[in-house]
Amino acid sequence: MSKSMTRSFLGLLLAASLPWGSGVGAETLDVSDPDQALLAGNKLICANTPGEVSLYWWQGVVYSRIPGEKDRRLFDVQGMNVRQCGRFEDEVRGLGFRSVSREVMLYLDPETGEVLDTWDNPWTGETVEVVHVHNDPVNSRAVNWSRDEEGNPRATFEPDLVINGTVLRGGGAARLFYNNPLAGDYQDFEGGKYHATEFLTMAYPLEDALNAEATAIQDAVISWGRISGWLPWMKMRGRTGIMVHYTHGMRLFDWADLPAVLRDEIEANYPTFMAPPPVDDDRPNETTWTVFKRIVDDKRASGEWPEQSAR
């Protein structure tokens, strides 16, 4: 961080202790205290009040990239994540939060904007059934505590970049590489592991994070991207190439703020996803790959789809 940016952040922290902006007269969190630092940071993830539901939405485009050919715009997407946080307190570890959520992302026809039921694969010529993202749950694996097992401070709130009172957060990547539930037991030898990289950038008012009376940072905008292999329902059968997701979105105030195409589809076909799981939800997380595996297994068990041949 440059010295000018450091001074800017320190100046904003000092200014936040004074009556200014929409937080006139509001108490300010002391982020040198790990409990209060956690309160400031958790506002972006969900809300600090138990039972308060948070809703994030995004929209964007999915492109293909295959060596030797022009990138194609395959789909538009509309997505949302609905979540809440459980709040915990411990004599040694201090304050803690754990988020629980469900998420939906729809694949749309890039020409008409309509939700796709089937898709004509331009490389194989096959018409395939579209499986939209409907992951339930997408939870934090453990409680995020303000202190470690020995009571030492763990949580911090130190934004890297603040410009004109706005925190810009991003620049890193989630580099995902783990066993693919659709592959076999020999992935360490033959390959086939799930391999992707995800990027998330967020911007929000520093004042909202430091306002002790605010339970959440409502004015947050996001940009999410992913580079990955083909989606399993596309039936690409190992063809060379990758997919690039590029989206932008924001935190919404209410369910009614979702675009109609997304809201209507969830209400009609994914009503469970209108609310987050309970805070004590201990189910394993789902991904597109685990959901698709279950769909394939169910269809094969019912005879709707044939078993894969031995050759």
Located regions from the model:
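A eukaryote-biased signal for long
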Residues: V167-R311
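Bacterial N-terminal signal peptides
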Residues: L10-W20
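C-terminal cell-surface anchoring/sorting signal
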Residues: S2, P19-S22
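Bacterial N-terminal signal peptides that target proteins for export
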Residues: M1-L10
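Short, flexible coil/linker elements and helix-boundary hinge sites characteristic
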Residues: P19, N42, G113, G125, ...
